[in-house]
Swiss-Prot record:
Pfam family for this entry, one: Hexapep_GlmU
Domain of life according to the entry: Bacteria
InterPro entries registered for this protein in UniProt: ADP-Glc_PPase, ADP_Glu_pyroP_CS, GlgC_bac, GlmU/GlgC-like_hexapep, NTP_transferase_dom, Nucleotide-diphossugar_trans, Trimer_LpxA-like_sf
Lineage start: Bacteria, Pseudomonadati, Thermomicrobiota, Thermomicrobia, Thermomicrobiales
Organism this protein belongs to: Thermomicrobium roseum (strain ATCC 27502 / DSM 5159 / P-2)
Regions that span the bilayer: none
Catalysed conversion reaction: alpha-D-glucose 1-phosphate + ATP + H(+) = ADP-alpha-D-glucose + diphosphate
Gene3D superfamilies: Hexapeptide repeat proteins (2.160.10.10), Spore Coat Polysaccharide Biosynthesis Protein SpsA, Chain A (3.90.550.10)
HAMAP family (UniProt xref): GlgC
Protein name per the record: Glucose-1-phosphate adenylyltransferase
NCBIfam families per the UniProt record, alphabetical: glgC (TIGR02091), PRK05293.1 (NF003670)
UniProt pathway: Glycan biosynthesis; glycogen biosynthesis
């Protein structure tokens, strides 16, 4: 579809993911062992025949830029007939500073959709995990002669307040939109996927609209205004879609991949999820090892250890006698001999010392520093951290990036505590 331009919003910080997104943009967070979250939006584009793709970055873009590069893994390294471009905030005569919101990001990059005579512009969130063919949505949008079409999915009523929700009339047109309401009137959640007529989008941002708010955010400003002034439709998507914006939802979405028939099938030959992969040897499981219901990426070595219901990214080494259970361990981390890692998320290049125990005990006290993010028993270990041998670390513990052995004040880290190299913490 050469008449559709795609803009992927990938500049979000994702604060609710705690230290997982402290040193990288949320779309660059690893997922499912070998992938990153942005891989799903990019793969959906090329699998849908959409090759004109712009990725709008902002917060800590280095790892995301490095991952996407020229777009070769997604067949987006094209000089003609499409290709991927990465657009970052820039200083110019009429623009300054960072993007203030999703709509502001698109406004500052309108030049991208004027390069060719596109008919429509597809705007995607780059921080969701899903497998979606965009072609039926585009077809419905054009058949209904809609100005804007919003992809929606029903969610549990108890979760609806986490999303922007739409209210639809009997004739199928949207009559109201509420951004993360305390008392939602609908459970039809916006997926952060918007399909605009290009000319309407250009008119919206380049002409005066005296009765309009300042267009900073699509959910808060643009969509409510267009509901009053344009034809806004919905496209209901019933396939797999997950907002992995919290530590718990991120962990659950990864663990769901281990089911016999997961809703997100990474093995579907008709809908491949592409990624940038390093050249690494196959995973190796040595004598005496036990691996049950787990995903092991290339370069992993399990040396007579036990891995249960866990996901290991490339290059992870689990030493003899160690146990990894219900956990996510990212690239090139080493689990020392005899160590136990239970219900943890371990970032890249972490070293867990021999006989250390992470996820120790039954105390589920929330983390004192981030109680709203770490309260379900998951312990987080930041990138490049070194955990000393023999230490006991409870649940809902936050081990910051770059922590060294000398940053640990004792042999026991109680549940709900934090170890951070920036501050000295004294526990009673």
């Amino acid at each position: 579809m050469s008449d559709v331009a795609v803009m992927i919003l990938a500049g979000g910080q994702g604060e609710r993911l705690s230290i997982l997104s402290r040193q990288r943009a949320k779309p660059a967070v690893p997922f499912g062992g070998k992938y990153r979250i942005i891989d799903f939006a990019l793969s959906n584009c090329v699998n849908s025949g959409l090759y004109d793709v712009a990725v709008l970055t902002q917060y800590r873009p280095h790892s995301l830029n490095e991952h996407i590069g020229h777009g070769r893994p997604w067949d987006l390294d094209r000089e003609r007939n499409g290709g991927v471009v990465i657009l970052q905030p820039y200083l110019g005569r009429s623009t300054s500073g960072w993007y203030r919101g999703t709509a502001d990001a698109v406004y500052h990059n309108l030049f991208y959709i004027t390069r060719r005579p596109y008919r429509d512009v597809l705007i995607l969130a780059g921080d969701h995990v899903y497998a979606m063919d965009y072609r039926p949505m585009i077809a419905q949008h054009r058949e209904r002669c809609a100005d804007v079409t919003i992809a929606v999915q029903p969610v549990d009523w108890r979760e609806a307040s986490r999303f922007g929700v739409v209210i639809v009339a009997e004739d199928g047109w949207v009559v109201d939109f509420e951004e993360k309401p305390e008392r939602p009137r609908s459970n039809l959640a916006s997926m952060g996927i918007y399909l605009f007529r290009r000319n309407l989008l250009l008119d919206l941002f380049t002409r005066d609209h005296p009765d309009a708010p300042e267009f900073i955010d699509f959910g808060r400003d643009v969509i409510p205004y267009l509901i009053r002034t344009a034809r806004v439709a919905t496209y209901r998507f019933d396939g797999y879609w997950q907002d992995v914006g919290t530590v718990q939802s991120y962990w659950e979405a990864n663990m769901a991949l281990l089911e016999d028939e997961p809703k997100l099938n990474l093995y579907d030959p008709n809908w491949r999820i592409h990624t940038r992969s390093e050249e690494r040897p196959p995973a190796k499981i040595l004598e005496g090892a036990t691996v049950i219901r787990s995903l092991l990426s290339n370069g992993c070595i399990v040396e007579g250890a036990t891995v249960i219901r866990s996901i290991l990214s490339p290059g992870v080494i689990v030493k003899a006698g160690a146990v990894v259970r219900d956990s996510i361990v990212m690239t090139d981390s080493v689990i020392g001999p005899g160590a136990v890692v239970d219900r943890c998320i371990i970032d890249k290049h972490v070293t867990i010392g021999a006989n250390a125990y992470l996820g120790w005990g039954d105390d589920n006290s929330p983390n004192w520093l981030e109680p709203s993010r770490l309260n379900t028993g998951i312990t987080l270990v930041g990138r490049n951290a070194v955990v000393p041998p023999g230490v006991r670390i409870g649940r809902n513990v936050l081990i910051g990036p770059e922590v060294k052995e000398s940053d640990f004040p004792g042999a026991v880290v109680p549940s709900g505590e934090t170890v951070n190299p920036i501050a000295t913490v004294v526990w009673s």
